Curated annotation (Swiss-Prot):
<keyword id="KW-0699">rRNA-binding</keyword>
<comment type="function">
    <text>Binds as a heterodimer with protein bS6 to the central domain of the 16S rRNA, where it helps stabilize the platform of the 30S subunit.</text>
</comment>
<comment type="subunit">
    <text>Part of the 30S ribosomal subunit. Forms a tight heterodimer with protein bS6.</text>
</comment>
<protein>
    <recommendedName>
        <fullName>Small ribosomal subunit protein bS18</fullName>
    </recommendedName>
</protein>
<keyword id="KW-0687">Ribonucleoprotein</keyword>
<dbReference type="InterPro" id="IPR036870">
    <property type="entry name" value="Ribosomal_bS18_sf"/>
</dbReference>
<keyword id="KW-0689">Ribosomal protein</keyword>
<dbReference type="GO" id="GO:0070181">
    <property type="term" value="F:small ribosomal subunit rRNA binding"/>
</dbReference>
<dbReference type="InterPro" id="IPR001648">
    <property type="entry name" value="Ribosomal_bS18"/>
</dbReference>
<keyword id="KW-0694">RNA-binding</keyword>
<dbReference type="InterPro" id="IPR018275">
    <property type="entry name" value="Ribosomal_bS18_CS"/>
</dbReference>
<dbReference type="Pfam" id="PF01084">
    <property type="entry name" value="Ribosomal_S18"/>
</dbReference>
<dbReference type="GO" id="GO:0003735">
    <property type="term" value="F:structural constituent of ribosome"/>
</dbReference>
<comment type="similarity">
    <text>Belongs to the bacterial ribosomal protein bS18 family.</text>
</comment>
<dbReference type="GO" id="GO:0022627">
    <property type="term" value="C:cytosolic small ribosomal subunit"/>
</dbReference>
<dbReference type="GO" id="GO:0006412">
    <property type="term" value="P:translation"/>
</dbReference>
Amino acid sequence: MAQQRRGGFKRRKKVDFIAANKIEYVDYKDTELLSRFVSERGKILPRRVTGTSAKNQRKVTTAIKRARVMALMPYVNED
């Protein structure tokens, strides 16, 4: 018995924002850039959500953590 494929949509590949814009150094003072990688509650978004490479995800994570220590970004964003 032949299997029928259901028509659906093809998922679009996520693009690494940092590599696409050729950002070499992720600065902890650039909170506008870092806020793209943080949820509305203040949690760091995983790679599968943001689409960043492993290397750039590590850079983003360390920059976010430094910004939190320097009080440039909140640890928790309570509304």
